[in-house]
Swiss-Prot record:
It holds the Pfam family Elong-fact-P_C. This is Elongation factor P. GO terms for biological process: peptide biosynthetic process. One of its GO terms (cellular component) is cytoplasm.
């Protein structure tokens, strides 16, 4: 894999640190008044999910991680693994364990496309799209006189996630949810 110099560091770059693939979250170039310039890097270990910080002298180089982000369609779960299939027509399937899927489980819907990060052919992480459309399976009927301003109520979705929705939303309706914040965005027109 390619080597990256400190002047090529940017957020999102995948590098190898201590034998583990890591993703750079923040990169700050520091040039003190006296001494050599350096880069202060905040990174996330893609295997463990831990966040760390390290400094690199200006001009150092680091090996790039052999990590691939692929769009894959979620097929099903067998209780232990979550199965995904490549969307390029090859029908190649990968099984991701619970640690790779993480919090994405509450947004997993069959036949939807997710970004799966592979390292040496094994799934490291699964990222949902920014917005998903899910059906409400359970929510209380909203009574208009309950609040002085626009209120909200909890609603359980088909995936098991609970989202705060406005009072006018009813059971059985499809809604659009922001997966980054877990908030209701809008009603989906059918």
């Amino acid at each position: 894999m390619a080597n990256y110099s400190t002047n090529e560091f940017k957020s999102g770059l995948k590098i190898m640190l201590d034998g583990d693939p890591c993703s750079i979250i923040e990169n700050e170039f520091v040039k003190p008044g006296k001494g050599q310039a350096f880069n202060r890097v905040k990174f996330r270990n893609l295997k463990s999910g831990r966040v760390g910080e390290r400094t690199f002298k200006s001009g150092d180089s680091v090996e790039g991680a052999d990590v691939v982000d692929l769009d894959m369609e979620y097929l099903y779960t067998d209780g232990e693994f979550y199965h995904f299939m490549l969307t390029d027509g090859s029908f190649e399937q990968h099984a991701a364990d619970v640690s790779a899927v993480g919090d994405t489980t509450k947004w997993l819907k069959e036949q939807d496309v997710y970004t799966v990060t592979l390292y040496n052919g094994a799934p490291l992480s699964v990222s949902p799209p920014n917005f998903v459309e899910l059906e409400i399976v359970e929510t209380d009927p909203g009574v208009r006189g309950d609040t002085a301003q626009g209120g909200s109520k909890p609603a359980k979705l088909t995936t098991g996630a609970v989202v705060a929705v406005p009072l006018f939303i009813n059971q059985g309706e499809m809604i659009k949810v922001d997966t980054r914040s877990g908030e209701y965005v809008s009603r989906v027109k059918s």
